[in-house]
From Swiss-Prot:
[4Fe-4S] cluster binds at residues 83, 89, 92, 171. Keywords: 4Fe-4S, Iron, Iron-sulfur, Metal-binding, Methyltransferase, rRNA processing, S-adenosyl-L-methionine, Transferase. This is 23S rRNA (uracil(1939)-C(5))-methyltransferase RlmD. The gene is rlmD. The keyword Chaperone does not apply. Catalyzes the formation of 5-methyl-uridine at position 1939 (m5U1939) in 23S rRNA. Signal peptide: none annotated. Residues 12-70 form the TRAM domain. The keyword Transport does not apply.
Length: 450
């Protein structure tokens, strides 16, 4: 049988060609969208209302991807990125857009996803929770890369969609005291005899000081420990080591746990604080986390003796303040270590109307003897959402549901389930937890109507 040559869609001739395209919108991941020969073309770094020169990098049946070569006609929202590492580091992807433009885009994207996939067009759009656009991160993990040829250890962040480490000298979204430690730490780590055995470095800015967690794959000798101890004393920072088993050891002093305030000031009687073990999940934007907790309290309006269920409760980010307001709170978390720390936090805050349980949140927890009647519900799941949990929660019929989401796609899917079960979307608001990036977080309030 005769066979005829058919050009592959990703031929080198097609991909090497440069095109001039007009960008009309952003996708939900922050890439510009243009049209070419009936296809949608995604262009990272391009903004709406721009004319750009691009080079195709990938051709599919219904879409293509392109690399931005030049901005021919810039958008009024285009700004010069503040970070010198922006074009190589994979941490931020919207520094080229004004902060107001970023927030307008995120809010529009949130509404679009909710309307398209949940049919949730009602409710009141609440003002976005916003804060500082720079130096807002109180926690970051830096990667290390040891070059066997040069014997040099690089410290930085991963490049976008790559395992390569981009050495950095500063980070414009990291808390300034932590950013200022990057270069000194890079010099210190290169002075250690065990530098080939070092893993990531985590930097934390807490209310009780600054912390560094250094991952090690083998024990350090006394000389290396002495250098770390001297560095900690010089820079007024707590340093701890994390070994292969995940155990932590303080350097030059006993291990101190970082502490964050959730409500009020630590000197106030109504203050609530949260301590955590390095490695546990906490919200990296402290300013926005406080605003988020306050909004959740306002929307749920906990009353004394109401029973509130907090699913995916972590170490008590919402449970602790809810209990402080007088409600009886049940917190359920799937990670046993975080449940242990949540109980420590409840005791430290003198909260006795609060109980934490470790459980599989995809299982039917309504059958547990401790569950009982639930008046209100708070959900704060990971990116996968709470679809499995919502299957058994229909038995509980809480009057109010506050859903805190770090993924609008799973929020929309789960919202559709709640709407089908007689809930009405009352409030929806953007949470700008990660300025200078495309990431969208949101909070939604649902009330039972039937």
């Amino acid at each position: 049988m005769a066979q005829f040559f058919k050009a592959k869609p990703n031929s080198s001739k097609q991909l090497s060609a440069k095109l001039s395209l007009s960008v009309n919108q952003l996708d939900h991941l922050g890439a510009g969208i243009a049209q070419h020969q009936g296809k949608v073309v995604f262009i990272p770094g391009a903004l709406p209302d721009e004319t750009v020169t691009v080079q195709l990098t990938e051709q599919k049946k219904n879409y293509a991807r392109a690399k931005l070569i030049k901005v021919d006609t810039p958008s009024s929202e285009r700004v010069e990125p503040e970070c010198p590492h922006y074009h190589t580091c994979g941490g931020c992807d919207l520094q080229h857009m004004s902060l107001s433009g970023q927030r307008e885009h995120k809010e529009a994207a949130l509404l679009d996803i909710m309307a398209k996939f949940a049919g949730a067009e009602g409710g009141t759009l609440s003002p976005a929770l916003t804060g500082e656009g720079w130096h807002y991160r109180r926690r970051a993990r830096l990667a290390t890369l040891f070059d066997k040829n040069t014997k040099h250890l690089s410290l930085g962040f991963r490049a976008a969609s790559s395992s390569n480490v981009v050495p950095i000298s500063q980070c414009q979204v990291l808390a300034k005291p932590l950013s200022d430690l990057i270069v000194p730490f890079a010099k210190l780590l290169n002075q250690l005899s065990a530098k080939a055995s070092l893993g990531h470095l985590e930097l934390i800015a807490a209310d009780n000081g600054h912390f560094a967690v250094l991952r090690i794959t083998k024990a350090l000798n006394d000389k290396d420990l002495a250098k770390l101890s001297a560095f900690a004393e010089q820079h007024l920072i707590h340093i701890c080591l994390q070994d292969n088993e995940g155990q932590f050891q303080g350097v030059g002093a006993e291990l101190v746990l970082p502490v964050y305030q959730l409500l009020g000031d630590k000197a106030e009687s109504d203050a609530v604080s949260l301590s955590f073990t390095p490695g546990n999940f906490v919200q990296v934007n402290g300013q926005i986390n406080k605003a988020m907790v306050a909004q959740a309290l306002d929307w749920l309006a906990p009353a004394p003796d109401e029973r509130i269920l907090d699913l995916f409760c972590g170490m008590g980010n919402f449970s602790l303040p809810l209990a402080k307001m007088g409600a009886d709170v049940i917190g359920v978390e799937g990670v046993a270590e975080m449940v242990t720390q949540a109980r420590v936090n409840a005791k430290a805050n003198n909260l006795d109307k609060l109980t934490f349980y470790h459980g599989d949140l995809s299982a039917d927890l309504s059958l547990e003897p401790w569950m009982g009647k639930i008046d209100k519900l708070l959900l704060d799941p990971a990116r996968a959402g709470a679809f499995e949990s919502l299957q058994w929660l229909k038995k509980m019929k809480p009057r109010k549901v506050v859903y805190v989401s770090c993924n609008p796609a799973s929020l929309a899917r789960d919202s559709a389930v709640l709407l089908e079960r007689g809930y009405r979307l009352q409030q929806l608001g953007l949470i700008d937890m990660f300025p200078q990036t495309h990431h969208i977080e949101a909070m939604a309030l649902f009330e039972l109507t039937k």
